[in-house]
Amino acid sequence: MVIQKNWQELIKPNKLEVAPGHDPKRIATVVAEPLERGFGTTLGNALRRVLLSSLQGAAVTSVHIDGVLHEFSSIPGVREDVTDIVLNIKTIAIRSSSDTPKRMTLRKTGPGLVTAGDISTIGDIQILNPDLVLCTLDEGAEIRMEFTVATGKGYVPADRNRPEDAPIGLIPVDALFSPVTKVSYRIENTREGQDLDKDKLTMTVETNGAVSPEDALAYAARIIQDQLQIFVNFEEPRKEEAAPLAPQLPFNPALLKKVDELELSVRSANCLKNDNIVYIGDLIQKTEAEMLRTPNFGRKSLNEIKEVLAAMGLHLGMDVPGWPPENIEDLAKRFEEHY
């Protein structure tokens, strides 16, 4: 069907290369080619948007700091104010597969730096950037914090992370759940055979370590695939099961093909039709002399037919045992998919 050519005849990328960055668990460059012209931008932009906004991840959604009533406070013996501490907390990279909120705790006495690695976790929660500095304690200072970790996608502002029954002193935190931190892409020309007008898509993906760049890209592609499925309101054409082959057919099934399917010139086709030559099996049993005796059939038509038959491994003057078979029309239909 002509309509199927809309997608079946488009070039599909058949080459995918992954080049790890200086931190292979977090950075990678992926190259896909060849793509139809314009498809590099179409796919690159769609993948980038989904990577940054739609992948599930974990983040701190709220924090409670002992002795602190609100975000605009300061803590004795802590050099940073609470606002700065909360900003640092936002950047904690977390891996968690739990669907329910989890708790983390921190207790540290100065002097010294307080880092994400000082946080005590439970279950499957893992801190991916333990060297992240949260605050600095002076001699004798102490800080205690309790964090709530949840999973989600995209960016959720702090006001949406405040529970209705939030206790006094609970500070909601802006949550950036996406494990992907940066995505860029570029489009270059590439070759497909003799065609130089195709796209090469190069994407560089950086994550926080909760997911590999390759997996993140695969998840994004799957999301796009699933979202587009509803628009595919037709099914792929179903191939009917081929009828079983005759077990002892004494000739090549290609001989059951009709001569009007050989794409001959009008003159040659009409000559065969006037001579009641219907199938290739009828044609190849004719000799050159017999064909030249056909009205209006000349040397040019003869050469044309010889070339077509030669391309099929056949020639005029062949002996075909068992031709014509009984029920030739039924046999021709049964063997249609085999020639």
UniProtKB/Swiss-Prot annotation:
Its EC number is 2.7.7.6. Keywords: DNA-directed RNA polymerase, Nucleotidyltransferase, Transcription, Transferase. InterPro entries: DNA-dir_RNA_pol_insert, DNA-dir_RNA_pol_RpoA/D/Rpb3, DNA-dir_RpoA, RBP11-like, RNAP_asu_C, RNApol_insert_sf. It comes from the Bacteria. It is an enzyme of class 2 (transferase). Gene3D superfamilies: 5' to 3' exonuclease, C-terminal subdomain (1.10.150.20), DNA-directed RNA polymerase, insert domain (2.170.120.12), RNA polymerase, RBP11-like subunit (3.30.1360.10). One of its GO terms (biological process) is DNA-templated transcription. Pfam families: RNA_pol_A_bac, RNA_pol_A_CTD, RNA_pol_L. SUPFAM superfamilies: C-terminal domain of RNA polymerase alpha subunit, Insert subdomain of RNA polymerase alpha subunit, RBP11-like subunits of RNA polymerase. It catalyses: RNA(n) + a ribonucleoside 5'-triphosphate = RNA(n+1) + diphosphate. GO terms for cellular component: cytoplasm; DNA-directed RNA polymerase complex. GO terms for molecular function: DNA binding; DNA-directed RNA polymerase activity; protein dimerization activity. Residues 1-235 are annotated as: Alpha N-terminal domain (alpha-NTD). Residues 251-339 are annotated as: Alpha C-terminal domain (alpha-CTD). The N-terminal domain is essential for RNAP assembly and basal transcription, whereas the C-terminal domain is involved in interaction with transcriptional regulators and with upstream promoter elements. Homodimer. The RNAP catalytic core consists of 2 alpha, 1 beta, 1 beta' and 1 omega subunit. When a sigma factor is associated with the core the holoenzyme is formed, which can initiate transcription. Belongs to the RNA polymerase alpha chain family. DNA-dependent RNA polymerase catalyzes the transcription of DNA into RNA using the four ribonucleoside triphosphates as substrates. NCBIfam families: PRK05182.1-2, PRK05182.2-5, rpoA. This is DNA-directed RNA polymerase subunit alpha. It comes from Methylobacterium nodulans (strain LMG 21967 / CNCM I-2342 / ORS 2060). The gene is rpoA.
